[in-house]
Design a protein with these regions (language model features):
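PIN-domain endoribonuclease scaffold, especially VapC-family toxins
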Residues: 3, 13-102, 120-130
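Flexible glycine-rich beta->alpha loop in the catalytic core of nucleotide-sugar glycosyltransferases
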Residues: 117
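Anion (oxyanion) recognition and catalysis
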Residues: 105
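Conserved acidic donor-binding loop of glycosyltransferase catalytic domains
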Residues: 114
Length: 131
């Protein structure tokens, strides 16, 4: 199973034991790496330095992040429509979550996260795994 990791799983170690049995390929989008990179600008120099080290390790583990292309932009538009129809706003912090979801959907992959509520309403299009 192809599984995209949400940013929060790079911040805190995933609970791999919660995964369904089988072999899995773990992927990260460039958007997740971008969101994770916010920590490298932390005002505390020790936290920023650790974030830089962690980013290098994650890039080494997961490779280049999958891109957000026109295809994913079209999927994002559909996700915005779903969210709006449900009475929620697709903007703000939710924007990046929807873009991360669009990359996973475009790749035909599941999305693993700690914060399933960030992706409420997308389940018809996206298999979400709580870790």
């Amino acid at each position: 199973m192809r599984i995209h990791l949400d940013t929060n799983l790079l911040i805190r170690k995933p609970r791999w034991e919660l995964l369904p049995p089988g072999s899995h390929e773990y992927l990260v989008s460039a958007l997740v790496f971008a969101e994770f990179s916010e920590g490298t600008a932390h005002p505390d120099p020790d936290i920023a330095a650790q974030a830089r080290i962690d980013l290098i390790q994650h890039r080494s583990t997961y490779g280049d992040g999958l891109p957000f292309t026109q295809r994913e932009a079209d999927i994002y538009r559909e996700l915005c429509s779903i969210v709006t129809t449900a009475g929620r706003t697709p903007g703000g912090k939710r924007r990046v979550d929807l873009m991360i979801a669009a990359v996973a959907i475009g790749d035909g992959a599941a999305l693993a996260t700690r914060n399933t509520s960030d992706f409420d309403g997308l389940q018809p299009l996206l298999h979400i795994i709580t870790l």
